[in-house]
Curated annotation (Swiss-Prot):
Gene3D superfamilies: 3.40.47.10. This is Chalcone synthase. It catalyses: (E)-4-coumaroyl-CoA + 3 malonyl-CoA + 3 H(+) = 2',4,4',6'-tetrahydroxychalcone + 3 CO2 + 4 CoA. One of its GO terms (biological process) is flavonoid biosynthetic process. PANTHER family: CHALCONE SYNTHASE 1, HYDROXYMETHYLGLUTARYL-COA SYNTHASE. It is an enzyme of class 2 (transferase). Belongs to the thiolase-like superfamily. Chalcone/stilbene synthases family. The primary product of this enzyme is 4,2',4',6'-tetrahydroxychalcone (also termed naringenin-chalcone or chalcone) which can under specific conditions spontaneously isomerize into naringenin. Pathway: Secondary metabolite biosynthesis; flavonoid biosynthesis. The active site is at 164.
């Protein structure tokens, strides 16, 4: 008779979870940030609000974003005028779009990741799907399973409505799944579409306008597994440790609420200040066991909530400007895509590292940190170890 201990030992992987492939996707509709205020105030019938438009123009100019991709086109918005108002009942129309489009965009990213991984999709044992919008039953995880033709026995986990820290959360979950199920191959998909948060401007709610200036659409997928098959799988990063914490005195700093009008977005406190004040504590807790205290010796992947967060983190930790280079690049090319952002940055970093002929996937460095920041204020900290390019 086999003991529980023996079963448990056989279930566990030998080595740490590794990222084996990354894929990304965006909707085809690309919007230039410099002309976005003209488009936005026209499509929302708000051109008479000239002062507000000037404020929005300044927000967009300061955003450090060049362009964003959005599923919502002018044609779609003309068909749904309630989505262009600030507070008009429109949840049904929004839901009808996102329950279809979120799994579809997720599939595009997943197909690219599976292709890079190079293994048959029948070897995927687990699926983690993450999105901030489109709660439905059965969920986007089920829809993606059908779209990709995954096995019906794939073990699914659906994460709805987490927000911008969740790119770190999915790595934490995928690590635990991969390391505790020998041979597991976890497909992780973050798919974000702003059709639930898009709304017209309001003079009295400038925090909502901040969201309109920053958010973009995108999906990212990764394959995570421990004990990569030699000569068959090519690991990119090892996921060494993970942590999650709620920052002190940050209640209500970032909120999102599902209403008849869609998801409303609220910024109540000094978010960049709260993050920069507390970030070193998370770094010390994560890297002290490794004997690392020089934050410039790490490669950096930080959720780009907005330029002020990056500027204040950089200043607080005395980071060299190039440390947040990959993060700022993704912000400028795509905007804030919520949970998908950090996976886009991970992809950008390994690609640039290979193009430049650097010795590791982490800009030539061995150790790195991935941060997710979002509602709560919740911070996810992931310690990564790079591998040879």
């Amino acid at each position: 008779m086999v003991t529980v201990e023996e079963v448990r030992k056989a279930q566990r992987a030998e080595g740490p979870a590794t990222v084996l492939a990354i894929g990304t996707a965006t909707p085809p509709n690309c919007l230039d940030q410099s002309t976005y205020p003209d488009y936005y105030f026209r499509i929302t019938n708000s051109e008479h609000k000239t002062e507000l438009k000037e404020k929005f123009q300044r927000m967009c100019d300061k955003s450090m974003i060049k362009k964003r991709y959005m599923y919502l086109t002018e044609e779609i918005l003309k068909e749904h005028p309630n989505m262009c108002a600030y507070m008009a009942p429109s949840l049904d129309a929004r839901q009808d779009m996102v329950v279809v489009e979120i799994p579809k965009l997720g599939k595009e990213a997943a197909v690219k990741a599976i292709k890079e991984w190079g293994q048959p999709k029948s070897k995927i044992t687990h699926l983690v799907f993450c999105t901030t919008s489109g709660v439905d039953m059965p969920g986007a995880d089920y829809q993606l399973t059908k779209l990709l033709g995954l096995r019906p026995s794939v073990k699914r986990l659906m994460m709805y409505q987490q927000g911008c820290f969740a790119g770190g959360t999915v790595l934490r979950l995928a690590k635990d799944l991969a390391e505790n199920n020998r041979g597991a191959r976890v497909l992780v998909v973050c798919s974000e579409i702003t059709a639930v948060t898009f709304r017209g401007p309001s003079d009295t709610h400038l925090d909502s306008l901040v969201g309109q200036a920053l958010f973009g659409d995108g999906a990212a997928a990764i394959i995570v597994g421990a004990d990569p098959l030699p000569e068959v799988e090519k690991p990119l990063f090892e996921v060494v440790s993970t942590a999650q914490t709620i920052l002190p005195d940050s209640d209500g700093a970032i909120d999102g609420h599902l209403r008849e009008v869609g998801v409303t977005f609220h910024l109540l406190k000094d978010v960049p200040g709260l993050i920069s004040k507390n970030i070193e504590k998370s770094l010390v807790e994560a890297f002290q066991p490794l004997g690392i205290s020089d934050w410039n010796s790490l490669f950096w992947i930080a959720h780009p909530g907005g330029p002020a967060i990056l500027d204040q983190v950089e200043e607080k930790l005395a980071l060299k400007p190039e440390k947040l280079g990959a993060t700022r690049h993704v912000l400028s090319e795509y905007g804030n895509m919520s949970s998908a952002c950090v996976l886009f940055i991970l992809d950008e970093m390994r690609r640039k590292s290979a193009e430049k002929g650097l010795k590791t996937t982490g800009e030539g460095l061995d150790w790195g940190v991935l941060f997710g920041f979002g509602p709560g204020l919740t911070v996810e900290t992931v310690v990564l170890h790079s591998l040879t390019t």
